Amino acid sequence: GVARTRAVETLPVHARMIDGLAARTGLDRDREVLPHPAEIDELVAVGHGLASPELAVLLAHTKLGIKAAVLRTDLPERPEFADRLPGYFPRALRERIPAAVAAHPLRREIVTTMLVNEVVDRAGITFVHRLGEDTGVGADDAVRAFRVAVTVFDLPALWARVAALPGTVPTAAADAIAV
């Protein structure tokens, strides 16, 4: 995917993210098989980025960190995100028991997971981190900013057009359009 394609150019950001996760969440580089600073220096020297398994670990920890930060806020209860919860459940349940769906005991966690997945899957592993570095906003405000951009620029329509491109479009070109 895009993260793998851009792994070399985003290695400095990935390194800062790993450092931040280690400091804030106790991420264990050895247990997670993530490179230490000296190993990152070696990757830079030879022009490599993180490998796919390392990116997968970074992706998982990034999503967990954003989710934890968002759950500490009122964002999952905000009216602008109310449409997320029903979409998680099959249509039959939404139609048959809408009140039970709306009152689901894990609704905050479900909404948060859906929001975090959309942000990271669409904007990339580094989006929330870079926005925080550049502007000082927290993860919840980064999620809000993403939703505003999605709405203002009608990004779902663009994503649908990219998805509809013929299979003959090179992956790198489709990735560049998606980013």
Regions found by a protein language model. Give the residues of each.
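Ligand/cofactor-recognition surfaces for anionic moieties
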Residues: 1-179
